[in-house]
């Protein structure tokens, strides 16, 4: 039977009767019993042995005394090693156990200390401790990171603005007046139009510098404060193809119309209701008897 059915671990009550009805549970194996297999099997069904509960490990546990204490002596080859003496079970059961109840004050102090240590560890990993940042300044770590990125971008934009101004001044001296860079009608590719920047008073320009620097990272050209004119901005010109004037657009359209006379005719508007001359008659509801079940109130 044991070879045919797998053993299923179970918790059964000991049958030795040492403690009567209050006997402790004993770890034993219960076979998954099948009556069909028992009818076919001719082997006798034997009861479990009577000494099953006598050699359980939890009644007298094996506790090694100083597990790694004599390891160095064994490696050195010392033969005068006394055998490890096992303490009796009575002495192990009589060891007094001291239980201390943690108060809420101790738990709160431990939680606070653990939280502070985790915050300091996170700040060191994120690199916030290098710049002398302390969490008591009223700023979170994300805000300080944002301010540092903005400062770095501001310094980068200042260097870019100086180099572009030098390039613009050198190109204006060497090129004729028909180039797009010196033309009076410039295309301004920036987040702020000319009217919005020129209408600001002189006192608000210092406050709007931060906004300009903040948004300049999205645009292709940086809007920088002019070094010569303290009250205005220098807008970088569009370096690509020149925008055609309205007169050139009208000339090109007139030449296209003269080449193609069919373009002078207005487009035809096809309205089928006016062509046929009949009005759209509103159709009535196409209700069937089965639809009356939905339209009828529930009281009928």
UniProtKB/Swiss-Prot annotation:
* UniProt keyword terms in alphabetical order: Cytoplasm, NADP, Oxidoreductase
Q: Quote one Gene Ontology molecular function term.
A: oxidoreductase activity
Q: Where is the composition biased (Low complexity)?
A: 169-185
Keyword Metal-binding: yes or no? no
The UniProt regions of compositional bias labelled Polar residues, in chain numbering, are 191-209
Which InterPro entries does the annotation name?
Answer: P33MONOX
EC numbers: 1.-.-.-
> Where's it found, cell-wise?
Cytoplasm
Outline the segment boundaries, as ranges, of region: Disordered: 1-20, 75-95, 121-142, 162-245, 258-300
Where is it found, in Gene Ontology cellular component terms? cytoplasm
The answer to keyword Translocase applying to this record is: no
What does the record give as the function of this protein?
Potential NADPH-dependent oxidoreductase.
Provide the family line: Belongs to the P33MONOX family.
* Name this polypeptide is given: Putative monooxygenase p33MONOX
Q: Which organism is it from?
A: Xenopus laevis
Encoded by which gene?
p33monox
């Amino acid at each position: 039977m044991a070879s045919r059915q797998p053993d299923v671990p179970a918790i059964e009550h000991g049958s030795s009767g040492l403690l009567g009805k209050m006997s402790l549970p004993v770890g034993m194996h219960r076979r998954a019993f099948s009556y069909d297999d028992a009818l076919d099997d001719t082997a006798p069904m034997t009861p479990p042995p009577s000494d099953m509960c006598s050699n359980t490990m939890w009644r007298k546990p094996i506790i090694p005394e100083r597990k790694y204490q004599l390891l160095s002596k064994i490696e050195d080859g010392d033969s005068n090693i006394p055998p490890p003496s096992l303490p009796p079970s009575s002495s192990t059961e009589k060891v007094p156990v001291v239980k201390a109840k943690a108060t809420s004050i101790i738990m709160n102090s431990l939680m606070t200390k653990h939280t502070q240590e985790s915050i300091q560890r996170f700040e060191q990993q994120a690199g916030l401790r290098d710049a002398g940042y302390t969490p008591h300044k009223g700023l979170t770590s994300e805000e300080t990171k944002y301010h540092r990125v903005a400062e770095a971008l501001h310094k980068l934009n200042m260097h870019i603005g100086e180099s572009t101004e030098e390039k613009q001044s050198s190109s204006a001296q060497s090129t004729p007046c028909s180039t797009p860079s010196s033309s009076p009608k410039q295309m301004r590719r920036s987040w702020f139009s000319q009217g919005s920047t020129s209408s600001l008073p002189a006192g608000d320009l210092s406050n709007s510098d931060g906004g300009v620097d903040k948004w300049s990272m999205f645009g292709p050209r940086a809007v920088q404060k002019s070094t010569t004119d303290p009250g205005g901005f220098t807008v970088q010109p569009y370096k690509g193809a020149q925008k055609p004037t309205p007169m050139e657009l009208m000339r090109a359209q007139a030449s296209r119309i003269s080449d193609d006379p069919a373009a002078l005719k207005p487009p035809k508007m096809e309205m089928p209701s006016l062509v046929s001359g009949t009005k759209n008659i509103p159709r009535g509801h196409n209700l069937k008897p089965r639809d009356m079940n939905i339209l009828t109130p529930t009281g009928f």
